[in-house]
Amino acid sequence: MTIRILPARLANQIAAGEVVERPASVVKELVENSLDAGATRIDIDLEKGGAKLIRIRDNGSGIDKDELGLALSRHATSKIHTLDDLEAIMSLGFRGEALASISSVSRLTLTSRTVAQEEAWSAYSEGRDMAVKLQPAAHPVGTTVEVLDLFFNTPARRKFLRTEKTEFTHIDELLKRIALSRFDVSFTLRHNGKIVRQYRAATTLPQQEKRLAAVCGNPFVQHMLRIELEHQGLKLHGWITTPEGARQQSDLQYCYVNGRMMRDKLINHAIRQSYETSLRVDQFATYVLFIELDPHQVDVNVHPAKHEVRFHQARLVHDFIYQALSSALVQGAQVMAPTINEGAFHLPHCAEEVNPPVVPMIDTTQQERVWQAVQNTPDYPRKAPRDNDRDESDNPQVRERAVSNPWVASPKTASTGKERYGSASVSKKEAAVYQTLMQTPDLSDEEPSTASTIVSSIEAVKANIAIEKLGKAIQVVAGQYLLMSSPQGCVLISLYQAQQLKLRGLLNAQHGALKAQPLLVPLALKLNESEWQVAQRHSSALLQLGIELKSRTNHSIMVMAVPQPLRQQNLQQLLPDLLSYAASCSESQALSHQALADWLTQRIVVEKRDYTLAEAIGLIAELEQLWQGNLPLQDPHFITLVDFSASITALHS
């Protein structure tokens, strides 16, 4: 067979097989051209799901008369001119194939006018006849592309089109994705003469959230968390939802790289990993995320439909997304967890302004990862199966303990879009829960007065009576201590010791070994021979603590997993120090779990000097839950009775 160069019309129709899959593909290419032209308003008109008519009108920069015919030629574009331009693409289109491919399988009319022109011009092209006809037209500054009778000259492809409703649904979903990528652009969608969607330009955050609600629905907005992070030239911003906002299908997953819609396996793998411990098998995360980075660090010319990209520093991008979302979910869980309602405090002073939490940035490691997991990841994140998918709230013992605990408020239901923090309006039920902590006790027969509490405190100090239980929180003293009442009198609690008790409670292994959480990237540690021997000798004790080590050579080990309390620590420095501590113990002395937990507690907990009353109460509430009422109330470093004798003597003198 003779080798020949294909005719232009045939080459365009072959290219159309990749570019023009269905009417939604035409809308995508034309709307992206409008966005590249700087349009701030785009109108989309459809008839019969786009099979009969697709009309895209914008107010962009327009196309000059002399370039109208060239615009319909294959590989003709204004986006790139050199190889350097191809390696630093910021525009959505760049191949110059869309208009030529569309015109080869439809009847296309391109009408445009630039600011410099006094009149508009129209170019007409029909499938079999590739000749372009120019004629004057009436049109404002901008461009209108009209596509009639899609696939009229390729019956084999036309018969694969679905019903009008199905094709319109694809276009509607496409427009939602585009509308979320450009909040500054107004979009109007008409179908068979009726306005179906209208998204007004959103320049402020409330307006953007309004568009989010219009596209993703109110449940998304009610459970969403806004994130914005930047690290080593990478920027991640957008919205994710708490696990309560998960759905049974993956229809609310929107990700963009430099403004381009993406369904990339690497990105989805990182997102799936961050939600892995939060969602059930049949749940899907919901998010709208924007990733911005140097265009030289990403290759967008790797997929015919440009749905996938290739990152030059894929490991850095993957870890950045994973750490950012994991930290945001942890912060969100702390905000949405049962908290003390400020509105129930009835304090005479105004409530302090609540600052948004700062998500910590954790340095990414530089070790080799197993990319097979990334390659096998589906297009949408799906959580891996777990041994126990039951929510903790399903346990009646947990529910009973949470309700009976006077320190913690009942879990809130989904927000209604209003402010999530406490307000002055509090129900009687909430007030009843918190009054045991926050309200000054009433002078009644059933409850001792403040004066009697002070007298009891004085008598208890003199008699050296043991403290049996805690009562009401009164005030934070010197930023580090919490003054509380008790049946034995007023007591002062060290909040620094309380933090240590909290971590010790988290590291408690009384119910078996702590659960080891695998690291996304195993950490390699270089050790000397003695440290390596210590790691081998005490591997079982470390595993009981949730630290899983794997030997590589006589001078290095791999840290495969750590317990949850250590996830946010600098393991590169902490673990060698832990092994040094283990080496300092005598060889005959068995290294107990308690000894390791005590050392970690002393090493990790940092003294804080500016506790608020709400923070102090929340800390004590966590202690009550962790220790289940068995707090060391006899520890003089943790709690002490307050002796008012000297103060009373001074008042009477």
Curated annotation (Swiss-Prot):
Keyword annotations: DNA damage, DNA repair
Biased composition (Basic and acidic residues): 380-389
UniProt-listed SMART domains: DNA_mis_repair (SM01340), MutL_C (SM00853)
Pfam family, one: MutL_C
Source domain of life: Bacteria
One record GO biological process: mismatch repair
GO cellular component, one term: mismatch repair complex
Gene behind the chain: mutL
Native organism: Vibrio cholerae serotype O1 (strain ATCC 39315 / El Tor Inaba N16961)
Function description: This protein is involved in the repair of mismatches in DNA. It is required for dam-dependent methyl-directed DNA mismatch repair. May act as a 'molecular matchmaker', a protein that promotes the formation of a stable complex between two or more DNA-binding proteins in an ATP-dependent manner without itself being part of a final effector complex.
Signal peptide: none
Region entry Disordered, spans: 375-425
Protein name: DNA mismatch repair protein MutL
Family statement: Belongs to the DNA mismatch repair MutL/HexB family.
Xref: PROSITE patterns: DNA_MISMATCH_REPAIR_1
